[in-house]
Amino acid sequence: MAVGEKEHEGTVVESGGEKNDSAVVLSASGEKKTTKRKGLFSRLWNAIFRVRGDDFEKRLKNISKEEATVRNRMKRRSITRRNFIRNLIAFSVFFEVIAVSYAIMTTRDEDLDWKLRSFRILPMFLLPAVAFLLYSSLVGFWRMCDRRDQHTLEKLQAEMLGKINELKERTNYYITQQLIQRYDPDPAAKAAAATVLASKLGAESGLKVFVGDESQLEPTAGKNNAKHSGGLRNRKQTNTRGNSAETTPIHHSDNESNHSGTSERITGTEQNQQMVFEHYNPQEYAAHDGSWISRIAALLVGEDPSQSYALICGNCRMHNGLARKEDFPYITYYCPHCRALNKPKHSEEHSLIAPADTLPKVSLKPMESEVINSSSSTSERGNSPIPLLHTPEIVEEVPETAENETPN
């Protein structure tokens, strides 16, 4: 026992002899916890270069609490005001009915003095005045309190914004965001940093800066431009239809509309490149379907149906109107039913005859009202399910000699 006590005392002496800067703190459960004290150098460094994050955090927390208190007070005042106004109106109407009834019941006697009569009638006029004065005074007081709280709220918000800006300046927040945007491999972090920098730029310049994916904006802009250019072309073609007595089945769009919608048409061509077909059996194209009514109608407008070819889609075999015999080898169009691109069989030979530099190649995006058929084509379309507005889009590749020979 003595040896054990000596060993225990020895360990205690050794532990007490060691110098340790840690302070012993007893917790609520009775366990000892040691907290290491900071050295002199670390204290000086923190006193000179520290950001005082604890002070900022405490002040921002106090500001948020005060702001929440002010907002709750304004909300309670608004609820109290609504309840008071509702109750005041209800009680005013109730007591006014009682006052009117009392005045009618007590002034039936004709022998009453005018002073007594006026005294009995007075509550009927006095109650509305009292209610109005009470309403105006209390509402004015509440509005004054609301203005004061709103001013306090604005001051708190301005103070919080100033504290946050000061903290950002001390911690080089925007410089950090710029470095993240430049060198961080994570695209999400880059996008967040770009949003922060754009918001700062907008706040400094007073402009609204939108930061987003450009790929999401380009399709919408293309659709709007396509709708606008399509509307211009449709109006122009309707005017041409009303002025001309003899219409041709193919109308060339002018160069301005072609150049203005080049990007949209290229997009439409890329979307339909996977569905490209040749004209369906052009040698057996009988433009007329054998009905004498359609022949008579075509002859009345001055067009011989035997000199026209029917445009049959190579994919869905649908009838898409008529084309002249001399224009048929050069026609390329989109089928409005299946959106397939139909080209002539000998397009390669024609491309050898007329080089690509001299040909006015235009790839049009599928749009309505690109081809205006004559009345013969409308009569031919009697057995066809295609309505008048869903005519095929025509793309011509005509040499200069062919343009001089064929009428527009």
Curated annotation (Swiss-Prot):
Region (Disordered): 218-265, 367-408
Species in which this protein is naturally found: Arabidopsis thaliana
GO biological process entries: endoplasmic reticulum cisternal network assembly; endoplasmic reticulum tubular network organization
Protein name (Swiss-Prot/TrEMBL): Uncharacterized protein At2g24330
Pfam family membership, one: Zn_ribbon_10
GO cellular component terms, A-Z: endoplasmic reticulum
GO molecular function: ubiquitin protein ligase activity
Signal peptide (from-to): none
Biased composition (Acidic residues): 394-408
Similarity-based family: To C.elegans C05E11.1.
Biased composition annotated in UniProt, kind: Low complexity: 369-379
